[in-house]
Amino acid sequence: MKATEGVFDDSVVYVTKQGTQVGVQGGRIVVRDLNDESAPSQTHESPTESSQSGVEVLATFPREQVDTVNVFGGVNFTTPFLARASTDGIVLNYFSQHGQYRGSFVPEQNTIAEVRRAQYALSTAAELALAKSMIAAKIRNARTVLGRKGVRGTDTLRELGEKVTHVNSKDELRGVEGDAAARYFSRLDETLADGWTFETRTTRPPEDHINSLLSLTYVFMKNEVLSALRQLNLDPFLGVFHADRHGRPSLALDLLEEFRPAFCDTFVTRLINRGTITHDDFRRDNHLNDDVFSTYAEKFDSYMEEAFTHPYFDYRVTRREAIRQQTILLRKAITGELDNYHALEFDH
């Protein structure tokens, strides 16, 4: 979890400690140790919860500065907290202990008919134009990430990026994206420190430690995108590139594409190359050990709060702010306030 005190913007709270309880006390969100028998009951009916002596408080956050709470595994909520979350528009996202997305609680106030109506009315051509912008950015960012690590000979990625402009269907675009991903991942091994190797992308389950970290980071970043989409009243399940499937947040996966190389993969290689995570930190099933998972979540949150110069707006933003900005641009493109969607691209 974040530090117990401090002012923060667009705040996302991560609760990873097993056996904890999220409640409210006055104007603050309070995370308590549920294993303490003196902790307040989850079925408490009052709109707030009184302080109790002897209860270990693990963290507190100003309620008005929190817009998203992410919980992992065995974490419970009090009834008063859920009532406050509904009133305050706080989105709750549920994950397994090791980061698999399970579901969300989204207050009704987060839906606006006008925005959804425009989204549902998008033509196939408009959807393809949005998807092409996202995938072109993903391919360019992949080439940039490799170049920053000294990897040369990536002209094929450049050519595939240029090919995106000329595709005429989503299926054709998926083919180009798949070719680019294969080319990119075939060179990712060259960006890793000694003692680490990467051969090919594998999922469900990931077959090695690198793939495990990539999958976990994509889940975390997808949740950042999900949160932004919901806060801006877009339907995350109606995509423009990924095919619709029951329970799959296709639009979140679409927008995630441009962040995969520049944000996700860069974070994973940083953890590895700096020695923050080692092979000893994994279990036999390639999941992170519980204590290391908490460290991972803290590092990810800090990473999202790091600032960089936005290549399009030319001012400093955090990665979390950048995702929100891209979501705003996407919404404006969907509603017709912008003629085109400007994806996040890094040239160097």
Question: Where are the model-predicted features located?
Answer:
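A surface-exposed, charged beta-strand/loop segment in the N-terminal or early-internal portion
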Residues: 65-144
